Structures are given as C-alpha cells and as structure tokens.
C-alpha cells in the first residue's frame, strides 16, 4: 500500500504511476533529502517527539541508505513515486517502526522545497567557480594582449580601433555581473522552508530554528503558504543561467566568425575543433557552435518555468514537479558549457598581425579626425560633416586617409596641419583614449588589476 493510501479503496492505475512518478529524475536529490531528514530527526528527538534511541536509529539508517545509493546498491521503485518516499520506504523496511516516525510534522511539500534549496546552495557556488575559471582565462589573455590592436565594431562594421585586451575585458564585466546575480540568487535560496508542512505548518512543538542551524540556512521562511509554493528562487537561477548562456553565446559567436578565413583573427586548437566527414580541408568550431545552440535550450527552461507558475493558486500544486527537470538540465548545460569553453579559449591562438592590419584598413580613425578638429575649435557637428565629406571623397577615388596630402586635407578645412598624420595610426587612436573604461593599454591595465582583485574576492568567498 502507498504510504499515503489510507483513504483509498483502489490501487493507483499503472499508467498514472508512471505518469506521476518523478524518481527517474529527482533521485539526484538523494543527498539533500537525506541531509534534511537527518536534521529533521535530530530536531524531533531534541523536542521529544521521538526518543533519542529512535533518532539514532533513523540517522544511522539514513546514513546507510546514502552509502548504499552511492555504491549503486539501491534500485529505486517507480511505485514509491519520488526520492522522498523511496528513502522513507527503504528506511522503514530496514529499521521498522521508528522509520514511520520520520515524517512527523513534515510534508513532502516542505520537504521538496527544502531539498531544492539545499541542492542550489551547493550548485550555485559550483557554477560560480567554473565562471571564475573562465574569467581568469579572459584576464590572463587580456594581460598578454594589452598592445594587440584590433578593429572595434558596431553593426558588425569596422568602427574604431581597440585592443584585444579591451575586447576580452568586456566579457569579464559581463561575467562579473553574472557572478553578482548568482550571489543575489543565493541570498534568496538560503531560506529554510521545513516546518511549513503541507501548507499551514503543524500543531506539534517543532523547532524550526534548530533545523535551520543544523543545515546551515541563514533564515527560516516567514509564511508557510509561500514556503511550499515558492519557486521564485528556481526562476531566478534559470534567469541568471540564461544570462550566463547569453554572454557565452555572444563570445561563441565571435569565436566562430573570428576563426573563419574571412576574419582570420584566431585559430582554435585541434583538440577543440572538429572536421568534416566529406570535406577534408575543414576545421570547424563545433564547441562554440554547440554553446551557441544550447543557449536556446536554457532560455526554453526559463520560459517553461514561468509558464508553469503563472496560474498556480496557493499553495502547493503538482505542477511544481516540473521545476526539477528544467533546473537539473539547466545546471548540467551551463556547467558543461563552462567546462569546455574555458580551455577552448585558453588554447586559442590569436593572429595579432592580421588583427592589426585589419584595424588600419578603412576609416577607423574618422572619429579621431573629427575630434582633432574639435580640439582646434570647430563644433563637433561641423567637424562630423567635414570628416564625412572626406570619407566620401576617399571612397569615390578609391583612396584612404593615409593617401591624402596635406593640401588635400586643408581643402576640406584650413584647421588641418601636419600633426593630422599622427592621428591616423591605429596605435594613436587607441592610446589617445586613456580614460577610465577606455581601450588604452594603461586604462586596460588598471581594469585588469581591478579584475584580479575581484577574482580574489570571489575565490575567497567560495573558500568560506
């Protein structure tokens, strides 16, 4: 008979059992479920709801079940529905009547909420650690390429010269915001729901604070209805994960076209590339493409979870079972992408001369020329028009700024002098932008110092 079967006269239809069961995926919560049950048992013994001997028997039994699961000696029962009932069933079979007392003052509703929070309390730092590893690679590469000039783009059109270091540090900042979002999410995960019961708590004299201390939670939930129905923390994590994947996908997209012959800015290591079954010459950036593709998968989980929650009345509803596969797959996807993307980027070889040459082509110095005129006293809008006319003139004649004589420059504005030629070099364009947040090597060097301090703080936080 089901552990909840007292009021039923017929057994559950087999189709319903299969449809209803979540053990195929929620079994990964066994550690959290057992940890929560051990803390609950200690509390029950401490307040006198079970005897010390019963508490010891329950804890010993749970520890043995955990060891057996880890050793692969446990076969889960679909008929027991989920990880909670499977463990309770195993416990009762092993220790007898004491096992039946474990669920005193507890519901699966607050139990599963607890398990998910415990799970994320472990998994979020794991994601942060992987993310910090990628950030470290970005910082190290940036430090190597402070002087590497490359084109900066808007609308995927060459805009102004920057450095590869500056470009890479832009991604450091994106991932730093992701770190902050994960910290923020973890704050709201770190609330202990056990004691909320099915929805309205219990009349029994439990000690919720004791359980929270035992499990390392910083707070207990303030409302029992909210505690069992809240999955905001899951949505928040899925949203944070979606942003991580978005940033990975943006970088992946650049890796993909940078590694093409058309750009030729980098070459991926053979270990992180694949070939073609038909075309012998091909070297494909499949890792980056898969990261880009898997981003949509994570977005889908976020949208799906929002759709699950949008119409749920208080308190618990079975719809909430849909949270786990979305959460688990998102975690697996994000961690997997970070694990493979980091060494792929670390082993990539940047073609410095190709980047430098591309940065010098075209009219990337146009803004610098306009600002040259501004420094000479011309209003910016007039300077903009003058330089636009210069660009049009060069395009019509198939020439570049560097091809123009001083007389030709002065035919567009008498403010041009010999010093204009010093403004046209890509290095001058970059070095002239030595402002906080700018691409000049000195400014990027300071950004790298700040980034190293940030990473040290993240690592210190993960070590606590």
UniProtKB/Swiss-Prot annotation:
Signal peptide: none annotated. It is found in: Cytoplasm. Pathway: Amino-acid biosynthesis; L-arginine biosynthesis; L-arginine from L-ornithine and carbamoyl phosphate: step 3/3. It catalyses: 2-(N(omega)-L-arginino)succinate = fumarate + L-arginine. PROSITE patterns: FUMARATE_LYASES. Its EC number is 4.3.2.1. The keyword Ubl conjugation does not apply. GO terms for biological process: arginine biosynthetic process via ornithine; L-arginine biosynthetic process. The keyword S-adenosyl-L-methionine does not apply. Keywords: Amino-acid biosynthesis, Arginine biosynthesis, Cytoplasm, Lyase. GO terms for cellular component: cytosol. GO terms for molecular function: argininosuccinate lyase activity. Belongs to the lyase 1 family. Argininosuccinate lyase subfamily. This is Argininosuccinate lyase. It comes from Moorella thermoacetica (strain ATCC 39073 / JCM 9320). The gene is argH.
């Amino acid at each position: 008979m089901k552990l909840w079967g007292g009021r039923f006269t017929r057994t559950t239809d087999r189709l319903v059992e299969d449809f209803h069961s979540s053990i195929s995926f929620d079994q990964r919560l066994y550690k959290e479920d057992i940890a929560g049950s051990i803390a609950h048992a200690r509390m029950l013994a401490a307040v006198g709801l079970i005897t010390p001997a019963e508490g010891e028997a329950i804890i010993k039994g749970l520890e043995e079940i955990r060891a057996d699961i880890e050793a692969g000696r446990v076969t889960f029962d679909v008929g027991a529905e989920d990880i909670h009932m499977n463990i309770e069933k195993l416990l009762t079979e092993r220790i007898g009547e004491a096992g039946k007392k474990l669920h005193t003052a507890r519901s699966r509703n607050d139990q599963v909420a607890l398990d998910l929070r415990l799970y994320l309390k472990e998994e979020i730092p794991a994601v942060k650690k992987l993310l910090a590893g990628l950030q470290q690679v970005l910082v190290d590469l940036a430090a190597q390429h402070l002087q590497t000039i490359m084109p900066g783009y808007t609308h995927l059109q060459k805009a102004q010269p920057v450095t590869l270091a500056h470009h890479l540090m832009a991604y450091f900042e994106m991932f730093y915001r992701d770190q902050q979002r994960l910290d923020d999410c973890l704050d709201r995960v770190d609330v202990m729901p056990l004691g909320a019961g099915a929805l309205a708590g219990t009349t029994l004299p439990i000690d919720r604070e004791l359980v929270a201390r035992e499990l390392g939670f910083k707070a207990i939930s303030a409302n029992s209805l909210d505690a069992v129905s809240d999955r905001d923390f899951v949505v928040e994590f899925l949203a944070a994960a979606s942003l991580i994947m978005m940033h990975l996908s943006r970088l992946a997209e650049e890796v993909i076209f940078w590694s093409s012959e058309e750009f030729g800015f980098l070459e991926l290591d053979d270990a992180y590339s694949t070939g073609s079954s038909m075309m012998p010459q091909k070297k494909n950036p499949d890792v980056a493409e898969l990261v880009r593709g898997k981003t949509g998968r994570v977005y889908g989980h976020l949208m799906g979870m929002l759709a699950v929650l949008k119409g749920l009345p208080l308190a618990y509803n079975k719809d909430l079972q849909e949270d786990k596969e979305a959460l688990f797959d998102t975690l697996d996807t994000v961690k997997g992408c970070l694990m493979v993307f980091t060494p792929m980027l670390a082993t990539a070889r940047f073609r410095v001369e190709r980047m430098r040459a591309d940065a010098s082509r075209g009219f990337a110095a146009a803004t610098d020329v306009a600002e040259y005129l501004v420094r000479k006293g011309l209003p910016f809008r007039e300077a903009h028009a003058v330089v636009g006319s210069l660009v049009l003139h060069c395009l019509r004649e198939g020439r570049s700024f560097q091809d123009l004589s001083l007389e030709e420059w002065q035919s567009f504005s008498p403010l041009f002098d010999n010093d204009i030629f010093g403004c046209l070099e890509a290095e001058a364009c970059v070095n002239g932008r030595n402002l906080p947040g700018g691409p000049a090597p000195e400014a990027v060097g300071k950004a790298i110092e700040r980034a190293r301090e940030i990473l040290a703080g993240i690592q210190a936080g993960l070590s606590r």
